[in-house]
Amino acid sequence: MNPARHSNFKAKRVTRNYVQTIQAPPSVVHSLICPVKEAEWLDGWDYSLIFSDSGFAEKGCVFTSRSTGEKDTIWLITKREDATCETNFARITPDSRVAEVTVRAEDGGQQTSRVHITYTITALTEAGNRFIENFTADNFAKDMKFWEATMNHYLETGKALSQSDPEHWLKYESGEEGKK
């Protein structure tokens, strides 16, 4: 069903940006922006690889990720450039939202990277609008800081940091996260 044709639904859209400092060169960071590798450094990452010629991140790679209480999110890698250490994704969470995600690592000097992350999320339904209302700049920054901390921890120790709230994305849907 197309909500725009069958109701007075008006989709909301939000763009959030964040720059991380990761203690590794851009090529190393870029290699970890992969559904398979992410399971090594991000606690609670639950995915299924649907298609990839190499078995890792590449243009055209399709995978799903899951969160309790939501339909699986479908991801498509639309750009994967090793020379610029950039990966672009399109992702759809059925009955909720669609998003464009860009992750680009650049040299930060002294074996570090500045990682530019952009999420542009568009609601498909009222549930998606609720997600966007609660996907505040502060909440996004909190998520990105955890991602930054766990990637740096993994690069130092070979282990992921424990995520205290693996279902945090659901709080955006319900509105709980926006109340904090």
Outline where the language-model segments fall.
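Short Pro/Gly-enriched beta-strand edge/turn motifs at strand-loop
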Residues: 1-3, 56-60, 82-88
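Short, P/G- and charge-enriched loop/turn segments at secondary-structure junctions
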Residues: 4-8, 62-64, 89-91
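Hydrophobic pocket/interface hotspot
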Residues: 28-33, 39, 63, 77, ...
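Residues that act as N-cap/strand-start positions at coil-to-secondary-structure junctions
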Residues: 14-16, 57-59, 71, 97-99
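Hydrophobic ligand-binding cavity/cleft-lining segments
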Residues: 1-55, 176-180
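Hydrophobic-ligand binding "helix-grip"
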Residues: 40, 67-124
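Terminal "cap-and-tail" regions of soluble proteins that handle hydrophobic small molecules
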Residues: 2-13, 107-180
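Ser/Thr- (and often Asn-) enriched beta-sheet segments in non-cytosolic proteins
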Residues: 15, 19-21, 46, 62-64, ...
